[in-house]
Every structure is written in structure tokens, then in C-alpha cells.
Amino acid sequence: MTGPHAAGGSNHRTARLVAIIAGLLGTLMAIATPLLPVEQTTAELNWPQNGVWQSVDAPLIGYVATDLTVTVPCQAAAGLVGPENRNRSVLLSTVPKQAPKAIDRGLLIERINNDLTVIVRNTPVVSAPLEQVLSPDCRYLTFTAHADKVTGEFVGLTQGPDDDDPGEAVRGERSGYDFRPQIVGVFTDLSGPAPEGLQLSATIDTRYSTSPTLLKLLAMIVGVAMTVIALGALHVLDCADGRRHKRFLPSRWWSMTPLDGLVSAMLVWWHFVGANTADDGYILTMARVSEHAGYMANYYRWFGTPESPFGWYYDLLALWAHVSTASVWMRFPTLLMGLACWWVISREVIPRLGAAAKHSRAAAWTAAGLFLAFWLPLNNGLRPEPIIALGILLTWCSVERGVATSRLLPVAVAIIIGALTLFSGPTGIAAVGALLVAIGPLKTIVAAHVSRFGYWALLAPIAAAGTVTIFLIFRDQTLAAELQASSFKSAVGPSLAWFDEHIRYSRLFTTSPDGSVARRFAVLTLLLALAVSIAMTLRKGRIPGTALGPSRRIIGITIISFLAMMFTPTKWTHQFGVFAGLAGCLGALAAVAVTTTAMKSRRNRTVFGAAVLFVTALSFATVNGWWYVSNFGVPWSNSFPEFKFGFTTMLLGLSVLALLVAAWFHFSGRDVSPDRPQRRWQRLLVAPLAVATWALVIFEVVSLTLGMINQYPAWSVGRSNLNALTGKTCGLANDVLVEQNANAGMLTPIGEPAGQALGAVTSLGFGPNGIPSDVSADPVMEQPGTDNFADSDSGVVTGTEVGTEGGTTAAAGINGSRARLPYGLNPATTPVLGSWRSGTQQPAVLRSAWYRLPDRDQAGPLLVVSAAGRFDQGEVEVQWATDEQAAANEPGGSITFGDVGAAPAWRNLRAPLSSIPPEATQIRLVASDDDLAPQHWIALTPPRIPELRTLQEVVGSSDPVMLDWLVGLAFPCQRPFDHRYGVVEVPKWRILPDRFGAEANSPVMDYLGGGPLGITELLLRPSSVPTYLKDDWYRDWGSLQRLTPWYPDAQPARLDLGTATRSGWWSPAPLRLS
């Protein structure tokens, strides 16, 4: 046979063969990729360096080395003997001896009394008297550490007759536990040339510092190419039906309606003024550091293990950060995703739901309102929920296109999109629903074509499409590495089980940002829309006027997604953001379900309206709270919203009233709607869900806009984002003011010595040592939802800033006080008086001498007093006067201080200098303590006007900084400390969030979780630096710490690098849990 038909048959036979071969090759290449070899960069720490006793810093991100070998000549211990060396005790250690818990975590070879002892993780391994160690018989001390055991031996020494094994080598071994010591460097108390034979060698765990070999790279290239070819062949087979190709985008895709404009305006404005999500700083820091590290490590937890298989979305953010790290730029892809979601909902989803949805304005407005109700509070950050929400929609649309055209290529594309969505983040598991609903259509379409092309030609390209994501996940990692990382994360935690899903909903009903008005309303209204859609479908077989298949698949995807979310390892409410796209779709279905056409009963529609009111009332029974800096200035951020009456009470009353109306419709026989045109207000009442969702959306947008207005000229998220458009992209760093030297701003007393001026007029009951020895801040009880964390390093976390917990000193200060002062205040020039006493308390009054105010044009904006104790605001005040008033001892007025800090610890009371009249030239402190409770007392230092510089000027953009994960997005110009080849850069500063944020979220980064705090607490000594938020002086924005090494002279260690080829199953050693 000749002609077009013969040619077409030949093409299809060729396409069938290509589909089979290319599809199978693509699948095989994908399956083989995780097992193919990679090129590993190896790293060893060898010490001593430069031939001298010199401490070096080498903090390992994985805490321990793969293996460790130490050899020390016995004669090296001579540097620890003799009166001239009494301050030297450590021959060699992997942690600074001064650090808290150093002996619990590290290796120390040290002199204890007259013995040289090897201690690892608080366990002695081997010990020998120093006189024997220094004898000619002793040659070397050796120590080795592996995952299964550690051993130590004094080579040349034998046990004496009184020991357990006379004549045997002096040797010790510990096993049955992973005793490998934590390494943050190599430290010694000795100096001078290193003796011959001294050697420490640690193999650093760089199993994740890998790149693909040429073989693996070629396999991935071939695999992707074969997949593309297979899908092309599948398209040729699809076209065998002879039908014309349908246009890819709907005809009205690029058109614009007023509703589109409104949704777009809301998203764009929210992009600037809206609240961010809690993990934005976490993700931004990971992305910023990943380029230098060579892989996307989980920076704040899990010992530097990679984010794979969920890291590809973060890799895109890392590329995006090359342009700018400013919030408004980094979140721009999220804005595009939001717009794309709405375009897909309005142009692809709603028309597919049937004629009733397509032509219903109520459906469109409800879809838009419920979509925004989800997107605004949950998806305005860097978390993967936005791309997951979009991916779910695109997967569903591709499936529906395949069903509508009876073609397999759209289904294959749906599988690719679904797989990418699935691995874009842990919450991508919600995309399982969108993939599962493709099974039915896939079977139907395959059955229609199998008789002509066979199963292999149809399913091989589908298999290649389903596995192509493997290339992305394992492009530079091995199967063994990722399996170990995944199981290790589960062991470290948090790793909550499916039956712990109630924790997520429990948090939804807390009075916190996790259970805020916006989040609670979004989830509850989605559940309500889902319930009414299911009920109507079950009662009538379908929602009248909607397409049966698409509407059922949307409902099915949503139900499956809720079930799939049970298997996420953490249970946070921000993870509900994956439902943003589905919420819009369900909103449209629910709106159609309660129209007068579908639900003719006025009683039932009124009951639905009552349910909407009740859900809204329940949503307002919490705070209008937002995470961290997004909360600044927002109305009702720490209280239930109210105006005259509580919103929740008013809405509950309206809900009850609606139920009474429904009962009247039922009992009066007026249940059926009259058949006449509806007025506009009646049409609004028929769409209560649209009214409620838009009311909440407006409430949210107005709240955050008012927050920006209320804060101005002080810092706010909105002001910062708008400033970024003018090139001011450093966020909070330009508004946090730092007091580098608290001694420099002390005011000069008039007519009194500095040591006596503080209590010169009256100091009844106040004394230099009237301060308890421990003034640590009150502990904060465990917060709701801490079940999301694994065990933390300490059971109770306090809000005490470092150095503000008090204590005593050996030497007395200028006025005889032995109290340890905070913030670097010099006791030789700074007096202190307190009203506390041991035993029975007594009333106390303090009135200081007058202090001279500097010229206003030369003075800073703040008046500050460092204080400790528990007292009310009015009990400490500053009185001001002119020179004449001060001479007559008649103050012109007084002001009180803002108390920002954690009682009873030391903190800085502050008052804006502008609150003191410009004619005032002198001030004095007045305090009264009439409360005789032992816990009620006051301690004060003299007033000062700090010399302030911005945090950006002090910290800059070059110093390595430990940015707590909550603050990363607010400080985009500060450089997070890097890590590379398994070794962490030593940070010089730490920036923390406010007290609540620091207490609640520091456990994420602690030692037990494998975070950076487990490193810095061993290597560095923190000290708090006073800070203030410009024009928002009474705000607890967070805090700044200066990090000082325990060994200031230690140098960064030099690593010996190499390369090695590793198979996909290779593993150097078990990862060690803390």
C-alpha cells in the first residue's frame, strides 16, 4: 500500500519503536544514576602546623571526624611539669578546656594532679603517672578513635605489680558506644617548636562534598535526552487519532478582568507590606551559604547533612540570591507563583468545573477570596509551599487535559510536574493526591490505545517521565549518602508519626502566630467548603451544574492531600500553605453548591451562612499575630480583635441569629425561594463564603498596612521593602543602633565624686552590695507545640542575655560593690546600688546627685540606665531641671523609663531624650522600693547617653556572623559564616531574635540537633552588646552578641585536600548522633 496512510503507518511504527527504546533507556539511566560513582573532595586535618605548638581552629560541621589518630612523644609532657608550668595542664585537646561541657564532648590529653590522662567524652581511656611518662622507657602516647571503639596506649610502659594486668602494656580501650570526640580545633597550652613525632591526623567527613564523574554526567545527559525523545515519540503516537491539536493556553489567558486586577493588586501590595513566614531566614541562609559549601546543607540542624531529596527548589533560590539577598527580591518568585496560581484557577480550573462555575460570579469571587485567604498568611515567604500549591494545580490541569484529549503526553507531563512538586519540600507529599488521580485516566487512555501500539510503547515513556526527577535529586550525591542522611534526620528528629497529626490542629487553636486569625480562618473555611462540596455530591450525585469528573477529582485531591500531610515529619500550621490553590478550586465548587439553583432550600442556605459566621467567629477567638518582625505595629497583635465588643462575640451572635432565621424558614413553610430576580444585597447573602473570605482578606491587608503606618518612621516590614526599591536593602541592620562602649556615654555628676554621686542625696536601704549573686532571668515554661522539636540540649531555656545574669567579683568596684556588671561596664568607674538584702527586706529610697546633660545637638537620642531587679515602671524615674531649679532642689518634672528585658536580670532602661524639655540641663535618678517581698528589689547604675552606630556599620557585610534562623531575612546584608569540606568558618558575631523567639527556637540549633550552637558554645565566649531599635525604643527587636574565641591566638587550620572516586554504595563511617 502506498500513499499518506502508508507513510503515516511507517511513522507510527518508528515512533512506537523509539518510544520503547528511548523510554526504557531513560528509565534505566535514571535508576542507575544514584548508584554511579561520584568524585569526592577528601580533607584531612594534620597537626601540628608550621612545626610549632600552635592552637588551630577547625570546627567540624558533622562534629566528629571519620577517624582520628594521635601520636605524642612522651617527653612532650615535660612542658606540663614544674612550678613554672603550673598554669599549663592541657597537652592536646580537640575542644578548648575552658568551654562549658568541654570534657563531656571532646578529647583532652591533660595533666590531672600528677598523672597524664587521656579523656574522651568524660570517660578516661588511659592514664599514667607523669614520672613514668617522662622516663626513658616511655616512647609515645598513641590514641585512635573509630566509630566502634577508641584506644589509648603509652608505648613502652608496662603495668606494675599492683595493677590489674602486671607486665601488660599500659593501654586502655572503650567500646560499645561511639566515643569519637567532637572536634572544633586542636588546642594546647604549650608553645615553641613541636617535637619530632608529634602528630594528630583526623579524616574529615566530606561524604557530601561530591560532584558527578564523567560517567555519571554522561548517564544523566543521555537519560534526560532519551526521556525527551520518548515523550516526543509519545506525542506522535497521540496524534495517530487524526484529531487536531488543541491550543495550549485558553483564548482568554492574557485578558484581564476587574477581579484579576483586584487579586493582582492584593498580591503585589502584600508582597511589600505583608508578613513573612517563620522559616524564611532559615532557607535564605541555607541558599546563601550553599554556593561556597558546594552542596545545599541543612545549615541549622542535622550536622550539615544535605537537604536532598528536597533541595532542588532551594538551589533555585541560591541562584536567585546572586542578584540580591533583599527580601523584596528573594520573594519575587513567590509573587509570580501567586499570580500564576490565580491565573490557572480562573482560566483553567473554574471553566473545567462546568458551566455553573464558569458563568457564576459568586464562584469566581469565592475562589479568589479563599485563595487569597490562604496565600497571604501562609505563602508570602521562601518556603516551598507556594511552588507546591502551583505544582498541584498544574498536575491536575495536565491530567484533565489528557482526559479531555484522550492523549498520554499531558499525563506524562503531569507525572513530571507532580514528581517535581513532590520533591520540592517535605510538604510536597501533598502532591501525591494529584498523582494518584492520574491513575484512573491513565488506565482509560492506555486501554484505548493499547490494541494499536501495545503496552510497552505507551508505558515506557510514562516510566521515563516518572523517573526523570531522579537526575535532579542525585545529580551530585549518591544513594548511600542520601539514605544515610534521611535516616539520620529521622533519628535526630523531629520526626513525628502520622498519628501525631493532631499536633498541627492543636497549634491552629493556640493564641500565637501559628493559630492567628488569618491562619485559623483559612483552614477552617477550606474544611467548610470541602464539607459542603462532599455533602452536595453525595446527596445529588454531583453538584448541580458542575462537571462530574473534574469536580470529583478536585475533591479527591484535597482529601488525599489532607491524609498525605499526616506523614510529614513536622506538624506546623504554615504547611497548610500547600492547599492555597486547591482552596480556590474548592471555594468555587462550594459557591456553586449553595446557589439558589443547586441548593433551593432557604433553610439550608441560611444554615450554611450560620456555619460561615460561626467559623469566622471561631477564627477571631485568637490574636491577630504574625511572625517576628512582621508583628511590629500590627493592631491586636497580642490580643483578640475588638471594637467596643469582641469581634468573636459579635460574629457568634450573628451566627445564632442566622440559625434562628433558618428555624423560622423551616417552621413557617417558607423554605423555598420565591422565583423572582434577586437584588444585589440578596445576591451577596447567597454567597456568604465570598463575603467572609474577602472581609478577612481586607482585614489582613489593612492590619499590616496599619502596622507600617503605626510604626513610621520606625522600622517595619513594609517600610523596609519599599526602601529596598530605592537601594536601601540592608533591612533591620540600618535601624538597629549599637552601643559599642557602655562606659563612653556616662554622664558627669555635678559636685560629687563619681563613686558617691549615685546615692549622694538619699540612699536609704540601697547599698553597693544590695544585689543577689544570681540575677538570671526567670525561666520560661515550655511553649505550645514544642512537640515539633526533638529533645533539646537543656530542659528549660531562659531569656537571660549573656553577661546579664550577675555574679560577684574578687575586687571591689569604685563604691565598694562586688557585683559583676553587665555590658562591659567598668566597675572601677561605675558605681552600683541595690535594695536587696538577705533576710527581712526594708523600704528603700534612692535619690542621686544631679548629672550634667550635654548639648542636645551633640548628644545621642537616648537616656539609658542599666538596672536589675523586679519593679514597676513608676518606681524608677528620672527628674530633670534647669540649673536654677537644680540649685533650688526643685525638679522641673520627671519621666519614667521603658523597661525592655527579662527580669530580674540586668537590662537597659531607656527613655528618648526628646521627652526631656530642651531647656533642661541636669537630671537625677529617683527610685523607691516599698514592696517588702524578697523577689522585689531594684539595682541601678548611673545614667548615660550612649554613643550609637548602626549594626550595619559595626558588624558590616564582611565579618562572618551567626544569624539565628529566625532573623536571616531581616538582615540580608550580614554574611552568614560559611562551611566547606566539612569545616565551619568561625563567626565573630551572633544576631538573635526577640526574647520569645530566642527561647522558642534556639533548641533547633543546639548540640543534640547537630546545629551551630553545639559548635559555638565550645569554641567561643559570647558577650551581649547593648542595642536599640531606632524610633521604636521600647521594642524588643532581638539582641547582638560579640563572639570571642577561648583561644584568641588560634589560627584557622590548614586542610590537606585530595580527591577520590566513590561508588553509590560507599560510606566512610556511621554518622554520629549527639
Curated annotation (Swiss-Prot):
EC assignment: 2.4.2.-
Further comment found in the protein's record: This is one of the targets of the anti-tuberculosis drug ethambutol [(S,S')-2,2'-(ethylenediimino)di-1-butanol; EMB]. EMB is a first-line drug used to treat tuberculosis. EMB inhibits the transfer of arabinogalactan into the cell wall.
The name this protein goes by in its record: Probable arabinosyltransferase C
Function, as annotated: Arabinosyl transferase responsible for the polymerization of arabinose into the arabinan of arabinogalactan.
One family name in Pfam for this protein: Arabinose_trans
Homology family: Belongs to the emb family.
UniProt keyword Membrane present: yes
Lineage per the UniProt record: Bacteria, Bacillati, Actinomycetota, Actinomycetes, Mycobacteriales
